[in-house]
């Protein structure tokens, strides 16, 4: 069994809005279920720290940035779609074996072979 990767994440929000709170709650649930404590999440309120948003070129909130493991990935906007978040963090792809992935992209329209 390979050692678990440590995920370093930043979540940029704009104040204590319902959208920001929903993003944080959903993300926390995903992280606890998928990472089981092998992550670090830094929440950055761009209203309180606009210089951090400028340095990291954040143009919209919420924005989730995966710093480690590489490559760096960003998910911008609604984080309520669990599958979208997992794909953005490269977790869903890692869960698929090569055969599952190939069969899922090769078999949607089996009529095309005729």
From Swiss-Prot:
Domain notes: Has 2 forms, fold switches to a thioredoxin-like fold (KaiB(fs)) when bound to KaiC.
NCBIfam families for the chain: circ_KaiB, PRK09301.1
InterPro entries, per database record: Circ_KaiB, KaiB-like, KaiB_domain, Thioredoxin-like_sf
SUPFAM superfamilies given in the database record: Thioredoxin-like
Keyword terms: Biological rhythms
GO annotation terms (biological process): circadian rhythm
Protein name, as recorded: Circadian clock oscillator protein KaiB
Family matches, as PANTHER family: CIRCADIAN CLOCK PROTEIN KAIB2 (PTHR41709:SF2), KAIB-LIKE PROTEIN 1 (PTHR41709)
Name of the gene encoding the protein in the UniProt record: kaiB
Pfam family, one: KaiB
Superkingdom per UniProt: Bacteria
Family that this chain belongs to: Belongs to the KaiB family.
């Amino acid at each position: 069994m390979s050692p678990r990767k440590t995920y370093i994440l930043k979540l940029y929000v704009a104040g204590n809005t319902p959208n920001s709170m929903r993003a944080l709650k959903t993300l926390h649930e995903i992280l606890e279920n998928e990472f089981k404590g092998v992550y670090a999440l830094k929440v950055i309120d761009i209203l309180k720290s606009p210089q951090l948003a400028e340095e990291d070129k954040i143009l919209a909130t919420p924005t989730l940035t995966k710093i480690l493991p590489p490559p760096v990935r960003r998910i911008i906007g609604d984080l309520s779609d669990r599958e979208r978040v997992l794909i953005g963090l490269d977790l869903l792809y890692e869960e698929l074996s090569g055969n599952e992935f190939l069969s899922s992209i090769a078999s949607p329209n089996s009529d095309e072979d005729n």
